[in-house]
């Protein structure tokens, strides 16, 4: 590895995104090469808990602050946090040079078992297979889980497959999915020492 490549590889991979609309004001700051430290306040307690799993198990330092129209419902804030997080991931990865690109992980949580497979392909896609038989976890509407993942996949420009192999408790299923997502994400964004600063695509661009 040349000195230039070595220097490029060690550049900090950080991002700051602010998304401000008539409905929400969301700020996301992250470091992909962190220790899992986090400060998260979206105003939605269950989403905060899930994002803490993402930070802890993905070793992503993550600060998120969101103020939204929660007096209406959680939909706008949930989606806009996903959008801003996806944009922050894309910003931190830039042209995706030197990463493994693909990631996969199976995560159990008691009776629940969920697999996540992802690809920073530049082609947004979500294949979502969680089977949640209740409408809410606490106050959090379970249909918002899919909306969150769709927003992240779209704006991080990743292909994201989420599959449930087992599970009865909705909280366990969703939390297992976030833990699996965290570990798959960690695998995909790790620097590949053999690839150095090359683009992980035969096309030469992602």
Curated annotation (Swiss-Prot):
**UniProt-listed GO biological process terms:** L-histidine biosynthetic process
PROSITE patterns linked to this entry: IGP_DEHYDRATASE_1, IGP_DEHYDRATASE_2
Q: Which reaction does it catalyse?
A: D-erythro-1-(imidazol-4-yl)glycerol 3-phosphate = 3-(imidazol-4-yl)-2-oxopropyl phosphate + H2O
Xref: InterPro entries: IGPD_sf (IPR038494), ImidazoleglycerolP_deHydtase (IPR000807), ImidazoleglycerP_deHydtase_CS (IPR020565), Ribosomal_Su5_D2-typ_SF (IPR020568)
Keyword Cytoplasm on entry = yes
Annotated EC: 4.2.1.19
In which pathway is this protein known to take part?
Amino-acid biosynthesis; L-histidine biosynthesis; L-histidine from 5-phospho-alpha-D-ribose 1-diphosphate: step 6/9
MF terms (GO), sorted A to Z: imidazoleglycerol-phosphate dehydratase activity
Q: What is this protein called?
A: Imidazoleglycerol-phosphate dehydratase
Gene name as annotated: hisB
